[in-house]
């Protein structure tokens, strides 16, 4: 027997085909509450799209510990080899709108939510180990260059190359973006990275700096520019389709989860800033340590409820993991949580996809769409109620040693913008170098001469062959 159709308030609907009217040809009636409710709700079905990472795909899965790292962290999800934790992972493009193609040249978001017994822990990463900028003060400016021109409403190569030519620290990420890895073949065939430096804290209160890596077990596959352009027209949801259908047929994608670790003493003695997200840590000096396996094995039942409303943020942490002085990371701690409060709502953590799987006891109350609000329990602290939530000093992080005066320090005092990009270029095969040069020259064609000349010097500083290749691709005579 089928269910009875109801209004949102549960009243049975007698007729869902015809509006109430004054006679068969007369005007409609305002007392048709079913019509009014249906139209009013339809007008409000959409929520604001994400300012970045608007186009995305998601799936549930598990994280399984394969190596004991309790020497580094007291987080309970790592307490035993073989332990499994439920996860939700959202992939995305960065600059495109919600209806943009999955095959655009763009970094990919790689955001993982771990539903642990101590709360939700999020690693909000990308498919690249670095980023374009170091300071969050420049993030709105940077994102504006990745969006549409304010007059023409078109994507504009002039503005993003102009921005990069004034931001030489972007060169490392630009080199990755225009390499063969700039257009992954779907989401299953790419690595993920936490990108930032984070911290792990063990039971003795000792802090270790860490970088997170997610190595695809499906193998790296990328799309040639011509294939990506074709798919953008014939199957713009290519990556979404590939991920969804693979999971539906039981071909579950997996990633090997690894860390790099650095002691506080090592970090303090390094000339290079270990908290600079435009640079990587040498895997020769800081080798990858396998930690576990991440597997995606269940598709969401409702895209809007579980993917569109999913809210990730680096402020979501659990005991045993922490942040670092990485400037971009610290900016994101505020920006992401604030974006969710605007986009999804004050109580976005109460939605099923965002809700912790452990008890939540706080003094936060009310707000739009609040559920429960802890009944008659006190809404202030400290209080005299024995059963009310109390702070837990044993979960305090160890003190972080700092030095220096409060000021606006010039992050460009570290002017080594080129060595990492140059090293990456020299690691590439001749075929990969040719593709990189072709991709860059193709997008720079038509950009103003002053921008080209300013950017060109960065390529030369990274590696003379890099600069010569771009110059030749642009038809610039260096003689």
Swiss-Prot record:
Residues 1-25, 350-376 are annotated as: Disordered. Pfam families: Catalase, Catalase-rel. One of its GO terms (cellular component) is cytoplasm. The active site is at residues 53, 126. Heme binds at residue 336. SUPFAM superfamilies: Heme-dependent catalase-like. Activated by peroxide. Residues 1-21, 361-376 have a biased composition (Polar residues). The keyword Oxidoreductase applies. GO terms for biological process: hydrogen peroxide catabolic process; response to hydrogen peroxide. Gene3D superfamilies: Catalase core domain. Transmembrane segments: none annotated. GO terms for molecular function: catalase activity; heme binding; metal ion binding. Its EC number is 1.11.1.6. Its cofactor is heme. Keywords: Heme, Hydrogen peroxide, Iron, Metal-binding, Oxidoreductase, Peroxidase. It is an enzyme of class 1 (oxidoreductase). Disruption phenotype: Loss of catalase activity, loss of growth on 5 mM H(2)O(2). It catalyses: 2 H2O2 = O2 + 2 H2O. The major expressed catalase protein in strain Corvallis in stationary phase. Decomposes hydrogen peroxide into water and oxygen; serves to protect cells from the toxic effects of hydrogen peroxide. PANTHER family: CATALASE. Belongs to the catalase family. This is Catalase A. It comes from Pseudomonas putida.
